């Protein structure tokens, strides 16, 4: 295991992270999330890797297919990454990651239990300058170990992480490589990916809006406003009654549609004898002014 650590860090130096969409203040991020399972779960790979640029997933890899594959709108992007070569890198990172999970399970002598190791690492740039980086692992949802590039050192949060720390700091060069990855290699990869991705991350897709109503016997009428196919994901959807904002009865989260856009909805309840005008208001960065869709009572 000790001899494998520099290999892992070297791979991290070569591999690029994922970047979130650019917003108006010029922020982008690249994030990788790794997940490993200690026990077999039917139809679920033991190891999975996802990469995101800002809030959009752009690649995936798992221990079943062992192929790095672009996702979503990046399926049409050519030249950003050598996915065949990246598959080899991800396989090596998978080996290290799962070996670490095995070490933890053995430390706690709990090979019969079901456990999860997750890792999250990446970097951010703002106005083309590095503005942050992160590299942390979680075991069964709890903090396990984190790299602090200011010290620099791995900071353990779990008794088993002391062993991981010893292995990952067995040679001073291991720590220096981790620091260099966060401060130099990751931002450089992010900038490289942005050359192919800014048109995706900076786009403004206006929302489509649909207003519907439903009334169950003996209940108030429910008005639903659905906004969909918009990007970026920040949006405000609310109902007004005679021009006054109404408290929603239900509000849906902003969710991915699966095509690189989002959807959200809000519901208000209307008393049976209420004849006041209701309208759905939608505010989004793609709109010059709020979109107002009145509910037409039938």
Curated annotation (Swiss-Prot):
Blood plasma, seminal plasma, urine, saliva, sweat, epithelial cells of various human glands, liver. It is found in: Secreted. Pfam families: C1-set (PF07654), MHC_I (PF00129). Glycans are attached at residues 109, 112, 128, 259. Residues 207-292 form the Ig-like C1-type domain. GO terms for biological process: antigen processing and presentation of endogenous peptide antigen via MHC class I via ER pathway, TAP-independent; antigen processing and presentation of endogenous peptide antigen via MHC class Ib; cell adhesion; detection of chemical stimulus involved in sensory perception of bitter taste; immune response; negative regulation of cell population proliferation; positive regulation of T cell mediated cytotoxicity. GO terms for molecular function: protein transmembrane transporter activity; RNA nuclease activity. Coiled coil: none annotated. The keyword Mitochondrion does not apply. Interacts with PIP. Belongs to the MHC class I family. Stimulates lipid degradation in adipocytes and causes the extensive fat losses associated with some advanced cancers. May bind polyunsaturated fatty acids. This is Zinc-alpha-2-glycoprotein.
């Amino acid at each position: 295991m000790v001899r494998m650590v520099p290999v892992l860090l070297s791979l991290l130096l070569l591999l690029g992270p994922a970047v979130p969409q650019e917003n108006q203040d010029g922020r982008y991020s690249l994030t990788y999330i790794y997940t490993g399972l200690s026990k077999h779960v039917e139809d679920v790979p033991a190891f999975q890797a996802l990469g995101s640029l800002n809030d959009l997933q752009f690649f995936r890899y798992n221990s079943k297919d062992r192929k790095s594959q672009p996702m979503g709108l990046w399926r049409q992007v050519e030249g950003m990454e050598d996915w065949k070569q990246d598959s080899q890198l991800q396989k090596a990172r998978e080996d290290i990651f799962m070996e670490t999970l095995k070490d933890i399970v053995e430390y706690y002598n709990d090979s019969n239990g079901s456990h999860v190791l997750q890792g999250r690492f990446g970097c951010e740039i703002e106005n083309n300058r590095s503005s942050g980086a992160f590299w942390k692992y979680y075991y069964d949802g709890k903090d396990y170990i984190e790299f602090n590039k200011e010290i620099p050192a791995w900071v353990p949060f779990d008794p088993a992480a002391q062993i991981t720390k010893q292995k990952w700091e067995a040679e001073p060069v291991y720590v220096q490589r981790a620091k260099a990855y966060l401060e130099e290699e990751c931002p450089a990869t992010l900038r490289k990916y942005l050359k192919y991705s800014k048109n995706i991350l900076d786009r403004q897709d206006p929302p489509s809006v649909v207003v519907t109503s439903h009334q169950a016997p003996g209940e108030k009428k429910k008005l639903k406003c659905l906004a969909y196919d918009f990007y970026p994901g920040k949006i405000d959807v609310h109902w007004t009654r005679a021009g006054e904002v109404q408290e929603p009865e239900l509000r849906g989260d902003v969710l991915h549609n699966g095509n690189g856009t989002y959807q959200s909805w809000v519901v208000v309840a209307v008393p049976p004898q209420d004849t006041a005008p209701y309208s759905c208001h939608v505010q989004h960065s793609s709109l010059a002014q709020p979109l107002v869709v009145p509910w037409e009572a039938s």
